[in-house]
């Protein structure tokens, strides 16, 4: 018994020693990365420049010129217009033993665009490769959504949720958390969906040379855009989801592989509720005329807002119809009392589409393609002030295809005219869905 106990103690001590050694190595690596981040900071490098001048007094004569110039170069790095020096980047963490695992990183935007595309990709991967583990890492607060589908999810709060944290510190948090995820799960692929790649994320994926790195991004990389100039080269493939409009603009030239994939839609027709079930859940009569309104901005209680003008115009047109207003999970709850109005705060709202007769939508990518796929006669309100997203051109395509009408100037009179006109529209039957050989092909090619 005594020898057995001593053997167990020895074995336990060896395990403790191994665990302690592993922890010490990881702490040393973290300290090394923190030192690199500090040495790469603006304050450190400006101080280094001053110190170098002090060590060689003749350089002090030129300091009034070199210091502003050096500050200017560091400023360009800070806003992404100049790549940081290679010495500021940390060495590779090669690991060829990859697991059947994919990490998806949807950033947080104004709405659900980035998240919805990654959520759709996650579900598509599961359909085509059920054994592949899909893991989310995101600053989006809606963590319950992937949990419902049993997708493990890591969360980091957005920078502006913290009271006192610098961009360097926040990027350090991203880098450390991603490296922990990569070490734990050993993913074979990483996919980012966002307009701006964070430096902490770039530093982390750079340390995983055997991991495939994808960037899903709508539109071209425009010359003069604010993305870090060296960021594209951190990825193996750029994925451009399809759109109703094509751009003729030439973007930034780069050598990274580009793939064009079908429009990314989350909900398939067979996943939608029937008309009867949708209306039952929404609490509207089966025989009623039902309009779905989702504009994404404006206060419903402001009588001059577009959404209030729209509600008033609809009820003036037909006081017996019902209106379902799509409310974002990211915003404050809407408070509006009208027996003909229902507030829908759910995700994804597309499961209710069979319960709607007509729709009034903003001209964003997701809204447009959802209406295009479901073929609900729609009045589009394009945002005319989005520099990177030509919503007007997209909505005009829908008008030309017979899907609906575009209202450029939203007055009550114009809205009323559009309401009357859209009721005579019967969208042509066409397949804009994602359940196609094209989807199977591009998802399979990634895996």
Question: What do these predicted regions represent?
Answer:
Residues 418-424, 432-447:
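C-terminal alpha-helical cap of glycosyltransferases
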Residues 275-358:
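Donor-nucleotide binding loops and adjacent catalytic segments primarily
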Residues 346-392:
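A donor-sugar binding/catalytic signature common to diverse glycosyltransferases
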Residues 106-119, 300-302:
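A short, glycine/small-residue-rich beta-strand->loop->alpha-helix junction that serves as a flexible
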Residues 178-197:
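Short N-terminal targeting/anchoring amphipathic segment
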Residues 96-106, 124, 128-177:
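Conserved nucleotide-sugar phosphate-binding/catalytic loop shared by glycosyltransferases and other
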Residues 69, 73, 77-89, 217-219, ...:
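A nucleotide-sugar donor-handling region in carbohydrate enzymes
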Residues 1-86:
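Boundary detector for helix-to-coil junctions that initiate low-complexity/charged tails
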């Amino acid at each position: 018994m005594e020898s057995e106990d001593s053997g167990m103690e020895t074995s336990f001590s060896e395990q403790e020693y191994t665990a302690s050694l592993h922890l010490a190595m990881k702490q040393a690596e973290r300290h090394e990365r923190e030192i690199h981040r500090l040495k790469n900071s603006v304050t450190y490098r400006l101080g280094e420049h001053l110190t170098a001048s002090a060590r060689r007094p003749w350089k002090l004569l030129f300091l009034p010129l070199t210091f502003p110039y050096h500050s200017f170069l560091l400023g360009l790095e800070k806003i992404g217009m100049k790549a940081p020096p290679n010495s500021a980047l940390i060495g590779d963490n090669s690991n060829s033993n990859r697991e059947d695992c994919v990490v998806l990183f949807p950033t947080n935007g104004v709405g659900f665009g980035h998240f919805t595309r990654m959520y759709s990709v996650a579900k598509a991967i599961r359909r085509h490769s059920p054994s592949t583990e899909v893991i989310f890492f995101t600053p989006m607060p809606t963590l319950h959504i992937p949990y419902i589908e049993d997708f493990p999810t890591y969360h980091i709060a957005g920078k502006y949720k913290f009271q006192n944290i610098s961009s360097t510190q926040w990027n350090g948090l991203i880098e450390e958390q991603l490296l922990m995820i990569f070490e734990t799960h050993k993913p074979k692929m990483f996919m980012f969906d966002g307009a701006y790649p964070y430096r902490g994320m770039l530093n982390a994926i750079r340390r995983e040379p055997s991991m495939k790195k994808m960037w899903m991004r709508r539109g071209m990389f425009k010359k003069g855009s604010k993305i870090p100039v060296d960021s594209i080269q951190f990825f193996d493939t750029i994925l451009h989801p399809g759109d109703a409009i094509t751009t003729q603009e030439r973007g930034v030239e780069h050598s990274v592989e580009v793939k064009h994939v079908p429009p990314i839609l989350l909900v398939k027709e067979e996943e939608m509720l029937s008309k009867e079930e949708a209306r039952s859940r929404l609490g509207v009569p089966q025989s009623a005329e039902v309009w779905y309104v989702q504009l994404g901005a404006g206060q419903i209680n402001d009588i001059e807002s577009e959404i209030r003008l729209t509600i008033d115009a609809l009820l003036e047109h037909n006081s017996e119809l019902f209106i379902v207003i799509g409310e974002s999970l990211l915003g404050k709850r809407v408070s509006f009392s009208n027996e003909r109005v229902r507030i829908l705060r759910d995700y994804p709202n597309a499961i209710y589409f069979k319960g709607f007769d007509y729709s009034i939508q903003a001209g964003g990518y997701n809204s447009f393609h959802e209406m295009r796929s479901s073929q609900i006669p729609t009045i589009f309100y394009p945002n005319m002030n989005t520099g990177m997203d030509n919503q007007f051109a997209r909505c005009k395509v829908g008008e030309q295809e017979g899907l609906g009408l575009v209202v450029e100037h939203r007055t009550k009179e114009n809205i009323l005219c559009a309401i009357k006109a859209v009721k005579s529209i019967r969208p042509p039957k066409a397949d804009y869905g994602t359940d196609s050989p094209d989807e199977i092909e591009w998802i399979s090619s990634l895996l």
